[in-house]
């Protein structure tokens, strides 16, 4: 098996860890706390990864003249995503109660799928060039894929009461890594360059930041402050551990 594809599959499997929480926590008194903690982990993790791991590391390698095009690109990205979210909020079933939780799970699935595809492309490409560097990159991905899987599985399961649906949504997001790797192997091997990768990463980081601030933050701000703090601290610890490892 292609080394890059192998590492991408391993990374994608860690996203499925969210299913463990979906299956094992059946006590209704703990449901709200589990959701709050998992969403808080996802919130801080998405912000830290998108800003420090993706955006800042990407633009520092760009020439100064590229900053204007990056700014314009970000504005366009934010506008499109913002309008998409506003349209979704107009849908009646997404307005109240469990509908909001389901909507959050769906949005997290879409966001993380879009995040995982370029991640799979990059992991596969790097690993096939430098396997040791590919291993480091994979360990970084694994650290943030775990809370990402939880942020999909828990909201979907507790809003629909369907384990099957929760599993399917997490699987969709997880397959993004593999899709990206296969896309890299089949189509992008000859045309992929640093500029294309940079703009893909910038696009992904802008999506992650907006989703974290527009969708996840409003969901957790009114919840139990202790649970929110625990989730944020866990997310920060995971991020720091990832930095130390790499």
Protein language model regions, located:
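Intrinsically disordered, metal-sensing/regulatory segments
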Residues: 1-246
